[in-house]
């Protein structure tokens, strides 16, 4: 599985053991997506929906004649936690996982 998201979110996925690729623009995300699809080796590629404004068109164009990878638009952390304490959530998640509170 590979994930294309903003650089901070991609880093989080890498820390979780997945292949995370950071993109700062829709053009950069599109280029990364094309590279990953052409290279092959992934059953699933998740893409931050903020970086893929027209997922249906991307799937149609990139996946013509291919079964894999499955392209999955996902909400980015910024959108998912809009108005919430992201730092507190991540700190609590780390504390539960490793048993220590880490102040970022």
From Swiss-Prot:
For this chain, one GO molecular function annotation is: ATP binding
Keyword annotations from UniProtKB, A to Z = ATP synthesis, Hydrogen ion transport, Ion transport, Transport
Task: Give any Pfam family that matches.
Answer: ATP-synt_F
Q: What Gene3D superfamilies does UniProt report for this protein, alphabetically?
A: 6.10.140.810, ATPase, V1 complex, subunit F
- Which residues are connected by disulfide bridges in this protein? none
Task: Report any one BP term from Gene Ontology.
Answer: proton motive force-driven plasma membrane ATP synthesis
What domain of life is recorded for the organism? Bacteria
What the record says about family reads: Belongs to the V-ATPase F subunit family.
Q: What does this protein do?
A: Produces ATP from ADP in the presence of a proton gradient across the membrane.
Which protein is depicted? V-type ATP synthase subunit F
């Amino acid at each position: 599985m590979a994930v294309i998201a903003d650089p901070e979110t991609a880093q989080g996925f890498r820390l979780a053991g997945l292949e995370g690729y950071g993109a700062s623009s829709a053009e950069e995300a599109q280029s990364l997506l094309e590279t990953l699809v052409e290279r092959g080796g992934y059953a699933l590629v998740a893409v931050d929906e903020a970086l893929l404004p027209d997922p249906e068109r991307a799937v149609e164009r990139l996946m013509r004649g291919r079964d894999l990878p499955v392209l999955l638009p996902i909400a980015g952390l910024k959108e998912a936690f809009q108005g919430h304490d992201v730092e507190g959530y991540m700190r609590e998640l780390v504390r539960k996982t490793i048993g220590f509170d880490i102040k970022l």
